[in-house]
């Protein structure tokens, strides 16, 4: 009697804003793609190229795309300075978003948006829910912050556009462990120490990415690190200890 391999149904979740931005800047070059009447299309072209590739590669039973909505973010209620350094979306990109959404609707792909939340917040919730339902989940995002969601059944796929061609790299729990020497959830602790200039999140002065990773590898969490400092059991020196 042969025992067959049970294949899990697949769920693909796409960070719409992240992939749209990556497509826009990846194909911008010296002259952006336009239609005959001058409408910009480089983000549309790049987004759809990435979408079609993941559909071909994974053949998911379920798929959804999450986008950010304008308005006050819940994260700003926790920290007012969140993304305060960000400029608005370029007009050349903004005018392509409705076209991308129109194509997604024509393809019968769900678009998910929620006031107060960013697309990656939505994806995180859906990914964990899908995993609990026994699905094999792939998150398509250009944001490595998504690595904190990686598990045995949740894979983060990072696209790269080179010379108009899309390449991807997958990160599951094993890949994150190999790359960082940490569990995916511990990357949150790393971010707390190093901060994130792109999101205007301050970190600990004098602590960069390599130091932050090393500290969490050694002390496992920010809480445990500070407990060791308070008790004098740490081996930090100079500015690391002062801050």
What are the roles of these predicted feature ranges?
Residues 7, 59-64, 109, 132, ...:
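Non-catalytic nucleic-acid-binding/docking modules located in mid-to-C-terminal regions
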Residues 6-140, 144-170:
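Noncatalytic, basic helical substrate-engagement surface that gates or grips nucleic-acid strands
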């Amino acid at each position: 009697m042969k025992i067959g391999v049970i294949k899990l149904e697949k769920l693909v979740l796409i960070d719409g804003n992240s992939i749209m931005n990556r497509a826009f800047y990846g194909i911008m070059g010296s002259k952006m793609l336009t239609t005959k009447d001058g409408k910009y299309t480089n983000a549309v072209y790049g987004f759809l190229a990435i979408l079609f590739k993941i559909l071909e590669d994974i053949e998911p039973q379920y798929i959804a795309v999450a986008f950010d909505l304008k308005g006050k973010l819940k994260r700003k209620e926790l920290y007012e300075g969140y993304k305060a350094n960000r400029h608005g979306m370029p007009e050349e990109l903004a005018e392509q978003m409705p076209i991308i959404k129109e194509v997604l609707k024509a393809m019968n792909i769900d678009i998910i948006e929620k006031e107060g939340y960013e697309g990656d917040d939505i994806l995180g919730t859906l990914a964990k829910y899908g995993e609990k339902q026994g699905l094999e989940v792939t998150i398509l995002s250009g944001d490595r912050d998504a690595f904190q969601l990686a598990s045995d059944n949740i894979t983060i796929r990072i696209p790269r556009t080179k010379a108009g061609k899309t390449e991807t790299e997958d990160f599951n729990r094993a890949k994150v462990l190999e790359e960082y020497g940490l569990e995916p959830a511990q990357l949150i602790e790393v971010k707390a120490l190093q901060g994130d200039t792109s999101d205007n999140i301050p970190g600990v002065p004098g602590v960069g990415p390599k130091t932050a990773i090393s500290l969490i590898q050694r002390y496992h969490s920010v809480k445990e690190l500070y407990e060791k400092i308070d008790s004098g059991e740490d081996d930090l020196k100079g500015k690391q200890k002062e801050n």
